[in-house]
From Swiss-Prot:
Gene Ontology CC terms, in alphabetical order: cytoplasm; mitochondrial matrix; respiratory chain complex I
Post-translational modification (record): Phosphorylation at Ser-250 by PINK1 is required for the binding and/or reduction of the complex I substrate ubiquinone.
Family: Belongs to the complex I NDUFA10 subunit family.
InterPro entries (UniProt xref): Deoxyribonucleoside_kinase, DNK_dom, NDUFA10, P-loop_NTPase
Full protein name: NADH dehydrogenase [ubiquinone] 1 alpha subcomplex subunit 10, mitochondrial
A Pfam cross-reference name: dNK
Cofactor info, note text: Binds 1 FAD per subunit.
Localisation per UniProt entry: Mitochondrion matrix
CDD domains named among the record's database cross-references: NDUO42 (cd02030)
GO biological process: mitochondrial electron transport, NADH to ubiquinone
Cofactor: FAD
Length: 355
């Protein structure tokens, strides 16, 4: 149900930009709904990816354990390279990119809580797996937004984690006994039918910080919930990164690894990036036709999230029909959520009959 609401709230990244631009224009009325989504006629008339993609049109992800400085490095890399920075997708990522950008209640965001996971990871109400399932969907949505931006503008993107590294948390949760084997099977089923449609990043940057140092940083940060994270859980995350994620990604893309000290020198990291040849991975096999189909997919957020809801009964992520109907109607009553963006009078939309 929550994923259904995520689909309802998700809109094309380019459509969001168009709508925002239309709201800023003064004078002659212009509609945020006028521009048609990219389609076959655009392609046939010459709007092709090869015209805007350059050697700097790259997808870069920055990965690492909790509190390793991923956000700082990703932001600095993006600024130095002239790329667009995508901060790590959290529970409220769909909220931040739709409506007024304000976080909605838990009922509309997977009914999960990161704070509760840290406080009670073995909670018998299924919060741990609901959280992981929802975060995968949020990262999937963000990755589609990043690819859409790349294919639409040609500008490179830098993300903090991605759908390709999300599983490290699932592995750690299962190893620590936080979730059941059935949850792992459900996750892998969803992942297998969604991730196959997406190209991996051109480059993965991994910040390697030992678990004791991670714990020291967590304590220094002072978040009362994060301070309850065990060293065993952090070690399992690190193991999943080093034993599975990095070996797999090294076959698909470039990989750079840095220590905590080395990662602080973003200038040196950028120099290393510029020396890379980017001579491996599926991006090299793409042409205008395949990138056309990829762009069609990533601009359609309903299709992006379609297979995150699969017909498998799992108590952790399943709710009854009556509750589904109630939450859906409550969601539709929220300001700006009843109709498509630009058609809701309660949030100030005007000239609706001309759109």
């Amino acid at each position: 149900m929550a994923l259904r609401l995520l689909k309802l709230g998700a809109t094309s990244a380019s459509a969001r930009v168009v709508a925002a631009g239309a709201q800023r224009v003064r004078g002659i009325h212009s509609s945020g709904q006028c521009k048609l989504p990219y389609g076959m006629w655009h392609f046939l008339l010459g709007d092709k990816a090869s015209k805007r993609l350059t050697e700097r049109s790259r997808v870069i992800t920055v990965d690492g354990n909790i509190c390793t400085g991923k956000g700082k490095l990703a932001k600095e890399i993006a600024e130095k390279l002239g790329f667009k920075h995508f901060p790590e997708a959290g529970i409220h990522y769909p909220d931040s990119t739709t409506g007024d950008g304000k976080p909605l209640a838990a009922d509309y965001n997977g009914n999960c809580s990161l704070e509760k996971f840290y406080d009670d990871p073995r909670s018998n109400d299924g919060n741990s797996y609901r959280l992981q399932s929802w975060l995968y969907s949020s990262r999937l949505l963000q990755y589609s937004d990043a690819l859409e931006h790349l294919l639409t503008t040609g500008q490179g993107v830098v993300l903090e984690r991605s759908i390709f590294s999300d599983f490290v948390f699932l592995d750690a949760m299962y190893n620590q006994g936080f979730i059941r084997k059935q949850c792992v099977d459900h996750y892998n089923e969803v992942k297998s039918v969604t991730i196959c449609d997406y190209l991996p990043p051109h480059l993965v940057i991994y910040i390697d910080v030992p678990v004791p140092e991670v714990q020291r940083r967590i304590q220094k940060k002072g978040d009362p919930h994060e301070m309850k994270i065990t060293s065993a859980y952090l070690q399992d995350i690190e193991n999943a990164y080093k034993k599975t994620f990095l070996p797999e990604m090294s076959e698909k893309c470039e990989v750079l690894q840095y220590s905590a000290r080395e990662a602080q020198d973003s200038k040196k990291v950028v120099e290393d990036i510029e020396y890379l040849k980017f001579d491996k991975g599926p991006w090299l096999k793409q042409d205008n036709r395949t990138l056309y189909h990829l762009r069609l997919l990533v601009q359609d957020k309903f299709e992006v999230l379609n297979y995150t809801s699969i017909p498998i009964f799992l108590p952790e992520v399943t709710i009854g029909a009556h509750q589904t109907d109630r939450v859906l109607h409550q969601f539709r009553e929220l300001p700006g959520r009843k109709y498509s963006p630009g058609y809701n009078t309660e949030v100030g939309d005007k000239w609706i009959w001309l759109k």
